[in-house]
Amino acid sequence: MIKPTPAAVGSYVTRRCDRLFKSAAAAAGSTVVAAILLIAIFLLLRAVPSLRANHANFFTSAKFDTTGDKNLAFGIRDLFMVTVLSSICALVLAVPVAIGIAVFLTQYVPARLSRLFSAMVDLLAAVPSIIFGLWGVFVLAPKLQPIAVFLNHNLGWLFLFKQGNVSLAGGGTIFTSGIVLAVMILPIVTSVSREVFRHTPLIQIEAAQALGATKWEVVQMTVLPFGRSGVAAAAMLGLGRALGETLAVLIILRSAARSGNWSLFDGGYTFASKIASAASEFSQPLPTGAYIAAGFALFFLTFVVNAVARAISGGRVNG
C-alpha cells in the first residue's frame, strides 16, 4: 500500500479549507441577499391589506388619513414630492462643493495636510443628525429667511421659487432642509470622489504636464475625465443617504395644511419623517400598514438609487 506523501496530504487539506471558506463566503453573501428579500416581503405583506382598504389613489393622492380602519385614505404624492425635491436640492448643492474639495485635497495640497483636511471632512459624517436638525432650525433658518424672500419676490414666476404651503418666516421649508441635507451628504460624496481622483494614472498627469499644461488644465484634461463615473456614483450614494434621512428633516420641516406644488418653499413630510412622526401610534394593523406602504415605496426608491450607483461605479472609472 502506497502512503500519501506529506505534500499530497497538505494539498488535500488546503483544498478542503478552500472549499470550506468558499462555502462560508457564499453563505455570508446569501445572508445579505436574503435579508433584503425578507425586508421587502415583510413590508409588502404588511402593506397589502391597507392598500386594499385604501379609498384614495396611493400614487396620486396628497391625502394621508389613517384615523380608522374604515376611513383609510392615503397617498404618497406629497411625501414623494418633498423627499425627492429636498434630496435633489441637497445633491445640486453638495456635488460641486465635494468635487472642489476632492480636487483640492488630491491635486493642490501636500500629502500631510491632505490627510489632516480629509480627516476633518470625514469627521463631519460623525455628527449626529439631530445636531444638524437643531442647527438648521435655530441657526440656518433665520439666516436663510432674507434669501428665501428675495428668491420668492424676484424668481417667483419659476415654480421652484413660488410661494409654498408654509410661511417663509419660520424657515421650515424644503429649501432649508435641502441645505442641511447637502452638508450631511458632503462627506460621502467628497470621500468617494477623493479616492477616485487619487487613482488618476500618473502617466496621464505627466503627459499633460509635458505638453505645458497648467495645474488647472491638468485637472480639466486628466483628473476630472478619469473620475467622471466615480463622481456620478458618489452623487448617487449621497442621494440615497439624503432620501432616507429622518430626524434632521423631521425637526426642520413644518407640517402643511394643504398640498405642495413642487416649490422649494413648501413644507410637509418626507417618507421617513412621516413614518417617524407617527411611530408612537402604530397599534392598529390597517393604519400601521398605511405607513408601512409608504416605507415600502421609500425602500424601493432607495434600492433603485443604490443599484444605479453600483452600476455606475462598476463601469469604467473614466466613464
Swiss-Prot record:
Membrane-related topology note: Multi-pass membrane protein
Subcellular location: Cell membrane
Keywords: Cell membrane, Membrane, Phosphate transport, Transmembrane, Transmembrane helix, Transport
GO BP annotations listed: phosphate ion transport
InterPro entries found in the cross-reference section: MetI-like, MetI-like_sf, Phosphate_PstC, Phosphate_Transport_Permease
GO molecular function, one term: phosphate transmembrane transporter activity
Keyword Transmembrane: yes
Stated role: Part of a binding-protein-dependent transport system for phosphate; probably responsible for the translocation of the substrate across the membrane.
Protein's recorded name: Phosphate transport system permease protein PstC
Source species of the chain: Mycobacterium leprae (strain TN)
Source taxonomy: Bacteria, Bacillati, Actinomycetota, Actinomycetes, Mycobacteriales
